[in-house]
């Protein structure tokens, strides 16, 4: 005899309706450490090969090319003049010292030659690529997406040329990307501390939420931003943008962890330490970079107090600082005077609206006389700073996707990358009359790459798709990365000064504005 259970009417499942936003998941960074470091090692090796191979070529008959002609000699002067430049005859000592000090390190090792004045820039180029791979891995929580970002930056023409020439922008890129990475780690660390406070029941002890303790990653970001400003003044833009970004991170974290008054909590608990870490610390680092200038008896404008500026001061400011201010103001006047309306023009200048798609690159060097080695009667050797079109030509849809993800989907990863990109782009519209060049966009390249890699991650890891669609996504991303690498390989001769035929040179110049 079979006994059956009495029929029962199972109650319908009641949907859970949360009266408040759900708490964020306990996700504070990638967990696949071994795979992450293996990816990093591969990316670093590829970056080193591309950045250091044939680093000493080309030159202008053994001398620097383009604006290397300013910075390589000034760095050499620093080596032999107690850390300061000794030849201001042309009035072109118009940037802070850190970038030139780094160039001088390479010259101290290898001497006054192309490898010497480019070595430090190549090292920083490799570091930047590794940083972008690691940062994108942390943003996406995917080692694969981080590796894609590293490959894309390796194959970017702007980053490639910036890493292999002794200009200051490559160093600036390294410092701002490193500072950005520190603030991303700081964001994860803040959320880990907020999570511990939640578990301990300390979230609502006060209306403003818990104190978050010493935040060393944010302090490190301040040091790096100070070094950025001590390389080029445009580092100040990143101080402002990154400062607002990290404060926004804090407000959102306090809101998501249900702090009763998150805005006031961020202002009360976080604003003061943020100002210290991202304003006071960078200013201190900037002043410290002038230590050789303060110690010198012959540095430019070192003893202006009592000469071109009076001995008396309304405030008890040391004469050395007053002299530095006088020198700084003179540099500011130099830069502010480089305007088109005053008759300052350059055949390769450009305006910022042309930068996102690399519409007006910069020709660093060209030689068409007595050049051989291309297998044709007429050969060309040229170095052009130009973005790899497979990435830069899609900048507008990439930015559109990033804005949509940031605003509509509230995806903080794209928002953070947009902040970095905007810091390198938007401030240049303030004075559009100023003489500007595409190499100013070098700071935009890493953040463009991050956004492209994050889009690749969206395609690879789109939730709710079947295996067939996932495979198609993998194929699409693989084809795109292969396209970028192929495009870079095609442009390689005009990024490195290899001899090519005149017909090949004409094929390399894709747009009329590239001429």
PLM region descriptions:
Residues 1-53, 269-282, 470-479:
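Start-transfer (signal-anchor) and selected internal transmembrane alpha helices
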Residues 2-8, 209-217, 225, 244, ...:
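Transmembrane helical bundles and short interhelical boundary loops of multi-pass, membrane-embedded
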Residues 12, 179-217, 247-257:
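Membrane-interface transmembrane helices that cradle and orient dolichyl/undecaprenyl
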Residues 39-43, 132-155, 174, 192-200, ...:
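Transmembrane-helix signature of polytopic, membrane-embedded enzymes
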Residues 52, 57-80, 266-267, 271-274, ...:
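Aromatic-rich transmembrane-lumenal/periplasmic boundary elements in polytopic membrane proteins
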Residues 52-58, 63, 67-101, 105, ...:
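Extracytosolic helix-loop segments that constitute the early lumenal/periplasmic catalytic or substrate-binding loops
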Residues 119-140, 178, 397-402:
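Transmembrane-helix motifs of polytopic, lipid-linked glycan transferases
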Residues 121, 161-171, 231-234:
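Short acidic/glycine- and proline-prone juxtamembrane loop motifs at membrane-interface regions
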